[in-house]
Amino acid sequence: MGKPDDLSDGPTTVGEMPLATSAIARPKKPFLLEQVAGPGAPRAFTLELDETVFGRSLQANISIESGGISRKHAVVRRAGPEFSVTDLNSANGIYLNGVKTHSAILREGDTLQMGDVVFVFHEGA
């Protein structure tokens, strides 16, 4: 049998690998819509798909039970680093920062309203 390892001499180096000292990789925060008002609030929805449909229908990616929301109310699309929202010809439309719109780019802190449901957009970091 061999002699037991003597660990008192310090650590054994098996191989060396340079470490990056300029930046430490951190996981990215997800892009999300935080629901701040309406049925089910407060809660948050992570935007992971290239297209996320919001609506009352169970076929919507994010289904919200509210009389002010159409079956397929709006879609949030990702194009590279940008997100946009487009109304899908809903009965009540969409409002970005209190202004009715058909389509718009989403920015950090924007409020998006669909019927009686209000979201705040948060960019990943």
Predicted regions and their residues:
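Intrinsically disordered, low-complexity acidic Ser/Thr-rich regulatory segments
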Residues: 1-65
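Solvent-exposed strand-loop boundary residues in beta-sheet-rich modules
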Residues: 37-39, 80, 125
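Forkhead-associated
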Residues: 41-118
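Short, Lys/Arg- and Gly-enriched loop/turn segments at beta-strand edges
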Residues: 119-125
